[in-house]
A protein has these predicted regions:
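Phosphate/dinucleotide-binding and metal-coordinating scaffold of catalytic cores
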Residues: 1-225
Length: 225
């Protein structure tokens, strides 16, 4: 089914969407998008990695009948923890506050494949999800947890991977770079949402260069911005 509605940034319309196509050119468009672009790849880029074992379990828990990337993301109105974009469907009378992700009751399912946190769930079987796990991208088993009204990402890793994340954070800090802070918690690393509760919109380098790891190309593309 083709998508008709609006690409939103908070409560502002960024672009009209008709039959999956972005109709308006706007400086607020995500870097992946431009006028005339098909919005489907952008939507799918926000999906939880389908190859993660716990992501498949997560979809079963919330009874997703269509487990495609696009359908999974749209179950949460394409909202994420790290930016303010979302999709408003034609016929909906809702505001940004109505789709904000504020439920971490699926955290244990997403991170460990266990169900301890589900007893507190409020939105598991609602038409639209308030959980951030459907749009928690990346290949590691991970989850978002709320602590003092702030989101923290927990990522399950091997000892070597945990060392690498924490070492790079401390090395960058030593040289004066503004780094995302990582700390160890058992067999996980933990980092606070570095967008400062969506004060900033996070755009990954993949939005600019895709999966190309050529340093020269990456530098040129970033310089052009």
């Amino acid at each position: 089914e083709l998508l008709n509605g609006y690409l939103m940034h908070k409560d502002s319309v960024v672009s009209r969407i008709e039959n999956d196509i972005i109709l308006n050119d706007n400086y607020r468009l995500p870097l992946m998008l431009k006028k005339g672009a098909d919005i489907t790849p952008w939507i799918c880029s926000r999906a939880v990695d389908r190859h993660r074992t716990n992501s498949r379990l997560l979809k079963k828990v919330i009874r997703l009948t269509d487990t495609s990337d696009a359908s999974t993301v749209l179950k949460a109105h394409a909202a994420t923890v790290t930016d303010n974009y979302w999709i408003k469907f034609d016929g909906e009378n809702i505001e940004y506050k109505n789709i904000l992700l504020n439920d971490d009751s699926l955290a244990d399912v997403a991170l460990f494949g266990t169900f301890e946190s589900i007893s507190n769930a409020k939105y598991i079987h609602c038409e639209y999800s308030k959980s951030p796990e459907l749009t928690n991208i990346g290949s590691f088993e991970k989850c978002w947890r709320l602590r003092n009204n702030k989101w923290y990402m927990y990522k399950k890793e091997s000892p070597q991977e945990r060392f690498s994340e924490i070492f790079i954070y401390k090395l960058g800090t030593f040289f004066g770079y503004d780094m995302a802070q990582y700390e160890q918690d058992g067999d996980c690393v933990v980092t606070e949402d570095f967008t400062l509760s969506k004060k900033y919109d996070f755009e990954s380098a993949a939005s600019i260069v895709g999966d190309d790891e050529d340093y020269t190309l990456n530098y040129k593309k970033l310089y052009e911005i």
